[in-house]
Regions:
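Flexible glycine/acidic-rich beta-alpha junction loops that bind and position SAM and/or redox cofactors
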Residues: 50, 154, 219
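Active-site groove signature of glycoside hydrolases
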Residues: 136-156, 177-186
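Hydrophobic residues in well-ordered beta-strands that form the structural core
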Residues: 42, 103-105, 145, 183, ...
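Loop/helix-junction capping segments adjacent to catalytic residues or to phosphate/diphosphate-binding pockets
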Residues: 83-86, 153, 190-193
Length: 222
């Protein structure tokens, strides 16, 4: 992929049981740090076509970021991990160290909606993301990105309650590891900036934030 095409496509701004909470106590655990504000990182989704075509694997990501693009940080997509066993993660961590790469965050898809309209859905959302909190901490990432859409035409006030419940449960789990939980505007209520501000105020947690997608915001996202 040419560098120009890569930059245009990325706009880079800087199952259960595979890995459990025991990793939080592992002697190889990375210290969770936020990246420098003036640095940039590569979002793995920008290279998804090459990955799906089999040109390289997740374990190669640190090398690709350093040798092809000369950047210092990488942002993972959870669905592009092969099988995240502890041995696999150790190799990935070593690859990043060998190439001087900071692993910034993990973008999580297919793990539930942060605006589920049932208590069961809210609880399951939090449970599903726990393993990615553990993996993020092990790798030294500082955040996990989530999706928060809600049912179509959901009442915005009710949606605030649903999401606050879901994210408070997840944040309770991520707090000991100091892993931030962030929302990307990927449709539904997350495309409403006023609603997002209200959710941030309602949850009121320093580990809770946003991860704006500036490429294709909805008409109401300003």
């Amino acid at each position: 992929m040419k560098r120009r095409k890569f930059i245009e496509s990325s706009i880079v701004l800087g199952a259960a049981g595979l890995v459990g909470p025991s990793l939080l106590k592992n002697e190889l655990m990375s210290e969770t740090k936020s990246p420098p504000r003036d640095d940039i990182s590569v979002a793995q989704w920008a290279l998804v076509e090459e990955i799906r075509a089999g040109k390289w694997k997740n374990l190669d990501f640190p090398k690709i970021a350093r040798e092809d693009f000369g950047v210092n940080g990488i942002e993972f997509v959870n669905t592009l991990f092969e099988v995240p066993t502890e041995d696999y993660l150790r190799k990935l961590k070593q690859n990043a160290k060998d190439h001087g790469i900071t692993m910034v965050l993990i973008m999580c898809d297919a793990e539930g909606d942060g605006c589920a309209d049932t208590r069961e859905g809210q609880k399951q959302f939090a449970i599903n993301h726990r393993k990615w909190v553990d993996i993020a901490h092990y790798l030294g990432c500082h955040a996990v990105r989530t999706n928060c859409r809600g049912p179509q035409n959901a009442d915005k006030k009710e949606a605030l309650k649903w999401s606050a419940d879901a994210y408070n449960q997840l944040l309770e789990y991520s707090k000991p590891a100091s892993i931030s939980i962030v929302i990307e505007n990927h449709g539904g209520v997350s495309n409403d900036p006023d609603w997002m501000v209200e959710l941030m105020k309602k949850v009121n947690n320093p580990l809770f934030g946003t991860y704006p997608d500036w490429r294709s915001p909805s008409k109401e996202f300003d």
